[in-house]
Amino acid sequence: LLLSAALLFSGMPVGVAKESPPFGLAIHGGAGVIVRAEMTPEAETAYRGALQAALDAGFDLLAKGGTATDAVVAAIKLLEDNPLFNAGKGAVLTHEGICELDASIMDGRERRAGAVAGVRYTRNPIELARAVMDKSPHVMLVGEGAERFADSLGFERVPNDYFQTERRRLQLERARQRDEAAARQAQRGDPSQSSADEFSISDLALDAEHKWGTVGAVALDRSGNLAAGTSTGGMTNKRFGRVGDSPIIGAGNYADNRTCAVSATGHGEYFIRANVAHSIASRMAFAGEPVHTAAQSA
């Protein structure tokens, strides 16, 4: 869970704030699913470089007086374009072997929001989510309807295989094999044996990423406005149009200038059931809790 960038400035002296309005940006590339022992120095360099580039893109906009929303979109767009992350290019695959992408954004000043779910052909879902917020009367558009809206605005369409990578195909194959192993065990009537027993540690480390690979950003601009954004490919081997918390305002994303901005990453079903992002803001607003306490309690 990533908390508000406003927290970074909660202790700043008033005099300093008047001379130089605070601003900041925080990003995440997933909830820490990569096993350090499995990561090569080259891979770590690649991940750190990609995260730094996204951070720099958003931070530079803020430094020049850009809005929090601009910064969030700029940072997330770079993560969507990088195949290392489970968002945009490099997203995980559904059971059918395609990418279905979700994204959302929220402006904390007026609590406006936009989201898309299940899109397959829009290159940068975070930009489409912002368009839903800025250029439609709606909050969420889904599937082909969202794609038609993108077409009406001239968004770039790409074939679905643009998003797909060999690494994600391998993860999908592992997930399918685990499903088949579980089915075999059920037929044998041996629930005591874990399906994981049929796979090596490295197989499981590879498969672990399928649960937590969401990317996101929160920002505070010089005008004191907060924004939050989240983008994801969801879970490997997901079925039946499954949608997690990332595009759901109040669950995986929330921003309110009066409290905080939140971009969540983790098991989406739990974030939805607990309405986590909004709960954090509500505990700050109504219980007077600081952001860290609110996050632990939500």
Q: What are these model-derived regions, one by one?
A:
Residues 1-11:
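Bacterial N-terminal signal peptides
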Residues 10-18:
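Signal peptide processing junction and immediate N-terminal pro/mature segment
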Residues 17-298:
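Alpha/propeptide regions of enzymes that mature by internal proteolysis
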